[in-house]
Amino acid sequence: MVVVGLGNPGPRYAFTRHNVGFLFLDYLKSKGWKSEKFFEWNKTELDGHEIVLVKPLTYMNLSGVAMPYIMRFFRVNVDDIIVVYDDVSLKLGKIRIRKKGSDGGHNGMKSIIQALGTQEIKRIRIGIGEKPEGMNLVDFVLGEFSEEEFKVLQKVFELSRNALVTILNEGIDKAMSVYNSLEVRV
């Protein structure tokens, strides 16, 4: 299984809402990342399953550019991939697991769907909350989490990790039925 977390490379974006995919992968494994031309990767073990963690380095809106390289490098097909990314239409504290679907207005996912030519891509969307009234969407997603929001996010990462374990052990349908209705709070 290859888990692709979406985000933007570089310290400027490290703790922004849009980098939830990268932050989740760092939660799973913080040290020992290796670099390739279009991505960084690492391996970790979840409940006895070895998984590969991948961060595309092409910036969010061009995430799809890295996908053919990732798939070739790890010798996987689209069925072996789960994409993890931020979602402004979900409350902070919620995740949504899907087997397939549209990009939902997310440019990183749009790029991946275009590059792979299919919407049948497994995904975990992590809620970052709706932008405040009157705030520009770009400013919101490129803004950093508050201290309180980051506490919630750590619990969301634990929930997302458990969802991944369920996907590995019992399948994505089971994970969807268990985790799509849950919400964490601090």
UniProtKB/Swiss-Prot annotation:
Signal peptide: none
Catalytic machinery residues: 18
Marked site (Discriminates between blocked and unblocked aminoacyl-tRNA) residue numbers: 8
GO BP: protein quality control for misfolded or incompletely synthesized proteins; rescue of stalled ribosome
Gene3D superfamilies the UniProt entry points to: Peptidyl-tRNA hydrolase
Uppermost EC category: hydrolase
Marked site positions, Stabilizes the basic form of H active site to accept a proton: 86
GO molecular function: peptidyl-tRNA hydrolase activity; tRNA binding
Binding site for tRNA: 13, 59, 61, 107
Biological function: Hydrolyzes ribosome-free peptidyl-tRNAs (with 1 or more amino acids incorporated), which drop off the ribosome during protein synthesis, or as a result of ribosome stalling. Catalyzes the release of premature peptidyl moieties from peptidyl-tRNA molecules trapped in stalled 50S ribosomal subunits, and thus maintains levels of free tRNAs and 50S ribosomes.
UniProt name for this protein: Peptidyl-tRNA hydrolase
Species the sequence originates in: Thermotoga neapolitana (strain ATCC 49049 / DSM 4359 / NBRC 107923 / NS-E)
